[in-house]
Each structure stands twice: as C-alpha cells, then as structure tokens.
Amino acid sequence: MDQFECINVEEAHQKMHQGKAVLVDIRDPQSYAMGHTPGAFHLTNDTLGTFMRDNDFETPVMVMCYHGNSSKGAAQYLLQQGYDAVYSVDGGFDAWHRHFPAEVEHAFGG
C-alpha cells in the first residue's frame, strides 16, 4: 500500500471487532480521556515508540482523530514508517460516537 485509504466507521468497527486491524486515536489527551473507543491505542508523539514496538508492521492500522482530517496526515506518516496497510477513519471519533454511542469509554469514571 503506497497510500493510506479512507474507511467509514462501520468498516472500522467491523475490522476492529474481527481482530483484523488495530485502532489508534490521535486526539489530545483531554479529549481521549473524556471519551474514546474501547481498545483504541492513544497514539501521541510520546507513545509512538511503544506502539511501533508492540505492533507488527503487517497488522493493518486504522487512525482516528476528531472529524477525519488530522488522521490523514498521521496515516501517511505511519505508512512511511513501514506499516503495510493504514486507514484513515472518515468522520473520526465524532462519527464513531454517533454510530456507536454505547461503545465509548471514559478514562475518568464517566
């Protein structure tokens, strides 16, 4: 894959629950803490090394941001780091929350 692909939240949801891809959330720490997709890895500059060490380059990666814009740059960056397949989630966490409101986890006991 030379270029990342965009997928919708339904496709991302299916891939994640089938174990066919990992989901990373690149939003700021406060937004992530207020609500995120269970099982999503919070990918930041500080956690990038851990993510790359713990995840195979062959495992597809789905990148989620706020609305599906910032994730595109992060997806391209991950491709450049050597990941075989990277996807940007259209609509980001906003779309995920609208489609799957029961599947939102809060870090602060919410």
From Swiss-Prot:
Coiled coil: none annotated. It is found in: Cytoplasm. GO terms for biological process: glycerol metabolic process. The lineage of its organism: Bacteria, Pseudomonadati, Pseudomonadota, Gammaproteobacteria, Enterobacterales. SUPFAM superfamilies: Rhodanese/Cell cycle control phosphatase. It catalyses: thiosulfate + hydrogen cyanide = thiocyanate + sulfite + 2 H(+); thiosulfate + [thioredoxin]-dithiol = [thioredoxin]-disulfide + hydrogen sulfide + sulfite + 2 H(+). Transferase that catalyzes the transfer of sulfur from thiosulfate to thiophilic acceptors such as cyanide or dithiols. May function in a CysM-independent thiosulfate assimilation pathway by catalyzing the conversion of thiosulfate to sulfite, which can then be used for L-cysteine biosynthesis. PROSITE patterns: RHODANESE_3 (PS50206). This is Thiosulfate sulfurtransferase GlpE.
